[in-house]
Swiss-Prot record:
Disulfide bonds join C96-C102. It is found in: Cell membrane. It comes from Mus musculus (Mouse). Residues 34-133, 157-242, 243-350, 351-455, 456-565, 587-682 form the Cadherin domain. It is a single-pass type I membrane protein. Residues 719-937 are cytoplasmic. SUPFAM superfamilies: Cadherin-like. One of its GO terms (molecular function) is identical protein binding. The gene is Pcdha7. Glycans are attached at T223, T225, N257, N265, T438, S478, N548. Calcium-dependent cell-adhesion protein involved in cells self-recognition and non-self discrimination. Thereby, it is involved in the establishment and maintenance of specific neuronal connections in the brain. Keywords: Calcium, Cell adhesion, Cell membrane, Disulfide bond, Glycoprotein, Membrane, Metal-binding, Repeat, Signal, Transmembrane, Transmembrane helix. This is Protocadherin alpha-7. Residues 1-29 form the signal peptide.
Length: 937
């Protein structure tokens, strides 16, 4: 029963131990021990293995070891019994100084598994340090004349221990003259001191020795002592006295070294050495005063030895001391007040504070740009500063308060005129001479989008040959924007409109960045002679600004159309016609006529006719007019001539390369009687055809009248709308191309500056209708005014077909065939010209056209040149077979006007088809009348 109880008790004890260990480990895992300082080697500290719950047998296998953050040799663990003991001397004052808490921190490390335990060992203080005075002996000199209760400070003792071991108490050896004044422990300001309780008498006791003892609060108590040696001094009854207690001196700044400031004097009523006075600065004088002033100890003179600067110090207060040579020395005191007088030796200082830079160019006047502060270290008028600005700038200074100015905007800014202002601010003080300083403020003007892109000119004229490849670069527009950065980033676009039935963008495009204009498809001069459109340039600003430029693209003709034969010949480049010719014709009689037209213009539409030679070298009795296409006899027809004459007429233009068409003309030679029979049959057939044509023409006339009326009304309405609209809409814009034409009197310049504006609305521009005011070069100066040509030039629209070719010119009643050969006369508007002076007349079309320079040269010959100041009597219109005569009228009859002259506009395809149908009937009539008809009806 006893054993069971003992077993249960042991089990409970073990369980309690395990619970404690678990609770210990669940805590911080730390052990706390304490040990007094100066403990001997081997002093027991604690059973660390047991307290950590480690078996003694595990210490070595698990590599039990102790590490210390402090000195690691102070404590050690016995691995045999698991006891922590003192290994070496522990000095708390050496380890922790005067700290109230002192501990040694250990880390216990075991392996398998690895565990770390923290152990804190508190080192307790013991009273092992006695109080210590700074010296073992202290000497004091006290005048015998000192009053009672005079206090003489003493330096106390110190104890290296802490806590109660460092609490000190003092006691003074017994005497009748002095008592000890000990302040409470919490008062650290008032030192330990001796208090005079009884007057001193040097003749009774010249020297007094006292012992001061300090005792700490430890157990046992430790003490420290100091020997006080008090010497009683004889009395020097009179101290030196200055004339005044305060001297005031004014000293200019920047005076040279050696300048006398003042000479002081002090007197002593004593005699002997007690009356001899020595001067000096007081002991509390600053080192700054000593570096600037020197005191003569004998004479009492104060001189300057350093730099006196008013801005550094406006006044110096110098305490002086005069001592006699008695024992003890008695001092006398006075004060020297040196007032420094300011000199204008400091220039103003400017400080610029940037607030809102850069400044937007649309800023309103009054906006504050920068704050400027000024400061002058001088005083009075020398420190009064005024500021001014660079003249002729849009800024001004506004004084906000003392020594502060605001740089404000005074007028409007324009970055495109001046992008940056270097504002010079000048500050000037009121001294004499005046000092000044400057500061530069760089004001950058920030850009706003206030400038639209601008083209170099409002209109460009571009000449492009037809049949260009798709995507061909035809022109480059460029606009300049005076703004900066994204406000100057220009993009280009087309101003879209309709050109006929199609959009402008189907013809051309413009590159948004480079401004290059490209033709998207081959251009056809016969379809579109002038393409007028606008290109818009817009910048990338917000809001975006833009402008437009007008491009007039003239499509230059190329020889891409062969001559086309007109009825009764078949359409195309070849055809056959039959004619009956009487053998009784006289030489030069016109028997037939080949009609042809070329859809090109200029030289490319100038047609010539050639008769191909007959096979076998037989000379044909017929010839063909070079430019008229008229077939006429060269001699009288003979019986030997073949009854059927087959003539091959080659029609070719003057393009490069030349294109041709061939007409076959079959002539049947008959006698005069047979000719009348054939003619009557032809006339009868023609009359029936004419009757049918008359009926058709009536309907055509009615239809044409109706369409014309509708067209006139439409044009009137359109003209009214266009007059009320802006002139830049559609295709109406002034152009400035210069056309230079060569004539018999030299070069003629046709300026478009006075050209009448031709508006084509939203449809394709009909650029063949152009008006020029002829400008002739000035002749030599003369008193007589040279006669000017009448600018009333009119060319009938009925001759438009003749502007492309030399077809059927006899219909105008102008051309006459001479009996003598191929010489021809080209018609003018007013009358037929006489025989040319020599050779063939100049081509009636714009011969010699240079597509690059647009210089027209008429006539291959060298005609007679007109004299200076004279005007040509005729010239040739490009694309026209006519020579225009200029009527010389008196000066008072001149009318300042310009009319339209057509430049080779082709007939529309539908009109040509109708004309071909009408020409078939007309040719039938001509076959019967060819023997007698020498001119066009």
């Amino acid at each position: 029963m006893v054993n069971l109880r003992g077993y249960n008790w042991k089990s409970q004890q073990l369980l309690l131990f395990l619970i404690i260990v678990a609770a210990w480990e669940a805590g911080s895992g730390q052990l706390h021990y304490s040990v007094p300082e100066e403990a001997k080697h081997g002093t027991f500290v604690g059973r660390i293995a047991q307290d950590l719950g480690l078996e003694l047998t595990e210490l070595v296998p698990r590599l039990f070891r102790v590490a210390s953050k402090d000195r690691g040799d102070l404590l050690e663990v016995n691995l045999q019994n698991g006891i922590l003991f003192v290994n070496s001397r522990i000095d708390r004052e050496e380890l922790c100084g005067r700290s109230a808490e002192c501990s040694i921190h250990l880390e216990v490390i075991v392996d398998r598994p690895l565990q770390v335990f923290h152990v804190e060992v508190e080192v307790k203080d013991i009273n092992d340090n006695p109080p210590m005075f700074p010296a073992t002996q202290k000497a004091l000199f006290i005048l015998e004349s000192r009053l009672l209760d005079s206090r003489f400070p003493l330096e106390g003792a110190s104890d290296a221990d802490v806590g109660s071991n460092a609490l000190l108490t003092y006691r003074l050896s017994t005497n009748e003259h002095f008592s000890l004044d000990v302040p409470p422990n919490h008062e650290q300001v008032k030192p330990l001191g001796l208090v005079l309780r009884k007057p001193l008498d040097r003749e009774e006791a010249a020297e007094i020795r006292l012992l001061l003892t300090a005792t700490d609060g430890g157990k046992p108590e430790l003490t420290g002592t100091v020997q006080l040696l008090i010497t009683v001094l004889d009395v020097n009854d009179n101290a030196p006295v200055f004339d005044r207690s305060l001297y005031t001196v004014k000293l200019p700044e920047n005076v040279p070294n050696g300048t006398l400031v003042i000479k002081v004097n002090a007197s002593d009523l004593d005699e002997g050495v007690n009356g001899d006075v020595m001067y000096s600065f007081s002991s509390d004088v600053s080192s700054d005063i000593k570096s600037k002033f020197h005191m003569d100890t004998v004479s009492g003179e104060i001189t300057v030895i350093g730099i006196i600067d008013f801005e550094e110090s406006k006044a110096y207060k110098i305490p002086l001391e005069a001592r006699d040579k008695g024992f003890p020395q008695l001092p006398g005191h006075c004060t020297i007040l040196v007032e420094v007088v300011d000199a204008n030796d400091n220039a103003p200082q400017l400080t610029v504070s940037s607030l809102s830079l850069p400044v937007s160019e649309d800023s309103q006047p009054g906006r504050v740009v920068t704050l400027i502060s000024v400061f002058d270290r001088d005083s009075g008028a020398n420190g009064q500063v005024t500021c001014s600005l660079t003249p002729h700038i849009p800024f001004k200074l506004v004084s906000t308060f003392k020594n502060y100015y605001s740089l404000v905007l005074d007028s409007a800014l324009d970055r495109e005129t001046i992008a940056n202002y270097d504002v010079i601010v000048t500050a000037r003080d009121g001294g004499s001479p005046s000092l000044w300083a400057t500061a530069s403020v760089s004001v950058e003007v920030a850009d706003v989008n206030d400038n639209a892109p601008l083209f170099a000119q409002p209109e460009y004229t571009v000449f492009v040959k037809e049949n260009n490849p798709p995507g061909a670069h035809i022109f480059t527009v460029s606009a300049m924007d005076a703004d900066a950065q994204e406000n100057a980033l220009v993009s280009y676009s087309l101003v879209e409109r309709r050109v006929g039935e199609r959009l402008l963008s189907s013809y051309v495009s413009v590159h948004a960045e480079s401004g290059k204009v490209f033709a998207l498809q081959p251009l056809d001069h016969e379809e579109l002679e002038l393409l007028q459109f606008q290109v818009s340039a817009r910048d990338a600003g917000v809001p975006a600004l833009g402008s437009n430029v007008t491009l007039q693209v003239f499509v230059l003709d190329e020889n891409d159309n062969a001559p086309t034969l007109l009825g009764p010949l078949a359409n195309g480049v070849g055809g056959t016609m039959n004619e009956v010719v009487s053998r009784a014709l006289v030489p030069g009689q016109v028997v037939a006529k080949v009609r042809a037209v070329d859809e090109d213009s200029g030289y490319n539409a100038w047609l010539s006719f050639e008769l191909q030679p007959v096979a076998g070298g037989v000379r044909s009795p017929f010839r063909v007019g070079l430019y008229t296409g008229e077939i006429s006899t060269t001699r009288a027809l003979e019986e030997t001539d073949a009854l059927r004459q087959c003539l091959l007429v080659l029609v070719k233009d003057h393009g490069e390369p030349s294109l041709t068409a061939t007409a076959t003309v079959l002539l049947s030679l008959v006698d005069s009687g047979q000719t009348q029979k054939v003619s009557s049959k032809v006339s009868a057939g023609a009359s029936r055809v004419d009757q049918r044509l008359v009926d058709v023409n009536v309907y055509l006339i009615i239809a044409i009248c109706a369409v014309s009326s509708l067209l006139v009304l439409t044009l009137l309405l359109y003209t009214a709308l266009r007059c009320s609209a802006t002139p830049t809409d559609g295709a109406c814009a002034p152009g400035k191309p210069m056309l230079v034409c060569s004539s018999a009197v030299g070069s003629w310049s046709y300026s478009q500056q006075r050209r009448q504006r031709v508006c084509s609305g939203e449809g394709p521009p009909k650029t063949d209708l152009m008006a020029f005011s002829p400008s002739l070069p000035q002749g030599p100066s003369s008193t007589d005014n040279p006669r000017q040509p009448n600018p009333d030039w009119r060319y009938s629209a009925s001759l438009r077909a003749g502007m492309h070719s030399s077809v059927h010119l006899e219909e105008a009643g102008i051309l006459r065939a001479g009996p003598g050969g191929p010489d021809q006369q080209w018609p003018t508007v007013s009358s037929a010209t006489p025989e040319p002076e020599a050779g063939e007349v100049s081509p009636p079309v714009g011969a010699g056209v240079n597509s690059n320079s647009w210089t027209f040269k008429y006539g291959p010959g060298n005609p007679k040149q007109s004299g200076p100041g004279e005007l040509p009597d005729k010239f040739i219109i490009p694309g026209s077979p006519a020579i225009i005569s200029i009527r010389q009228e008196p000066a008072n009859n001149q009318i300042d006007k310009s009319d339209f002259i057509t430049f080779g506009k082709k007939e529309e395809t539908k009109k040509k088809k109708k004309k071909k149908k009408g020409n078939k009937t007309q040719e039938k009539k001509e076959k019967g009348n060819s023997t007698t008809d020498n001119s066009d009806q």
